[in-house]
Amino acid sequence: MRKLSFKPVFDIDCEKWPTISTDFEIEHFLSTLSQRFDLEPITVLVRSKKWVREWSECPKAVACAWREDENSFVAFSKEIFVPLHPKWRVFRSWKERFFFLAVLHEFVHVYMRIKHPDILEPHSPEFFAMEQSLAREFGLRYLFV
């Protein structure tokens, strides 16, 4: 029996992703989503892959999200960026779709922790429903291969 896997692909006729090529632009995008969903702004951090994986206790993690002292944080692994200048980073094109999905994925984690603290399962059906809804809005969908 063949194992099904999926990859995210972009639809052409949907809302365009904003240009997010710096830490500030990622934070701005997440803050825009936060305003839309009535959340406080989210602080974006870039850390080592080792730090992200140790913090999240997941050997394949490239990002993580958490709440601390009523503030929300999202950390992304610096290995998914290509340094062009000390203050500027651009996404590696071959990982772009996966990174966009990771941005939405971590936002949904923050949203669920604030708006639905009673849902303890980190990847609940409600979590995936919201993630897929946001992904569809921006033209990101799953292609089963």
Language-model segments: residues:
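Short alpha-helical catalytic segment bearing the HExxH-like zincin motif
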Residues: F98-E106
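Short histidine/acidic/glycine/proline-rich micro-motifs that form metal-
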Residues: K16-W17, H116-D118
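Surface-exposed beta-strand-to-loop junctions
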Residues: K7-F10, E106-V110
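Auxiliary, metal-adjacent structural segments of Zn-dependent hydrolase domains
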Residues: W17-S72, Y142-V145
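Acidic, serine/threonine- and proline/glycine-rich low-complexity repeats
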Residues: M1-C14
